[in-house]
Amino acid sequence: MAKSGQARVPSPTERRHLFEVIQEHRHPEKNTAIMQISFKLGLRVQEIALLEFKEICRLGRVKKCAVRDFELHQVITLPASYTKGANALGRSKTKYERKTVSFSVDEFDRIVRQIENLALANADINPANFYPDVKQHKGKSRDLPLIDAELRKALTDYLVLRLEQKTSVKPGDPLFVTQKGGPYSPNTLQEHMALMLRDWAGIEKASSHSGRRALITDVIHKQKKSVKVAQKIAGHVNPSTTIIYEEPPEEEISEALNNIS
């Protein structure tokens, strides 16, 4: 079961309902492709937002009065820069706001003494001056096979539609665009994915991270693959991050409670 603050893993029934209800709203091809990538490849929301055509397919030549053809790749290669978020390409317009900070005991004692000295000197004290530096996420490139049939169909349907609407797209153009035609920022896509999961499909406590958690949990618990395999799929630099997903999923806990003798 997800810890407080963690995205909920939808059940198979909830997942089927999600893809059914997506068809009842605008832009079903795009939204289906986004959610299939989330559930079948486990990409982070910022990685989905930063995807470009060249990561997904090889575009054919532009032809007059003809729909542009394409060929889906067999493997998607995610650059390490994608895992660092939108700032890698300057798409994020939202200033980073820190929610928590942590110190060692020695560091905390040192800061307290500094604040005491400033207070005795009647100097201005700005808490932000004492925050530790923000740790920069290193990022890690990874290759993920595009072999799932439903995923490939969703991508094909969406690409056909995009190329019908605009044949002159370039390999470096964003794969997913908003209604206004611009690229998604991670924050905007995060909100949109949460809208589909919670409001459209009614999946309680779901978020843009639910598809990723569902995939990694499935790899570890149902497929019984090693943490190393799950780590590779997730793109975690440290295996300790992947270990979090070794917690039993909600459905196993529910089954255990239901079978009490």
Please provide the spans of the model-predicted regions.
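Catalytic phosphate/metal-binding cores of nucleic-acid and nucleotide-processing enzymes, i.e., regions
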Residues: 39, 51-53, 159, 181, ...
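Catalytic-site neighborhood detector that most strongly recognizes the C-terminal catalytic loop/helix
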Residues: 82-84, 234-259
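Active-site-proximal segment of tyrosine recombinases
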Residues: 47-49, 205-206, 216, 224-235
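Active-site/catalytic core of tyrosine-dependent DNA strand-transfer enzymes
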Residues: 12-15, 109-129, 147-203
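Basic, Lys/Arg- and aromatic-enriched nucleic-acid-binding interface segment
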Residues: 12-41, 45
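Helix-turn-helix DNA-binding elements, focusing on the entry/boundary residues of the two helices
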Residues: 34, 45, 213, 227, ...
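Conserved tyrosine-mediated DNA breakage-rejoining catalytic core shared by Y-recombinases
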Residues: 50-145
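Alpha-helix N-cap/helix-start motif at helix boundaries, enriched for small hydrophobics
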Residues: 34, 46-51, 117, 230
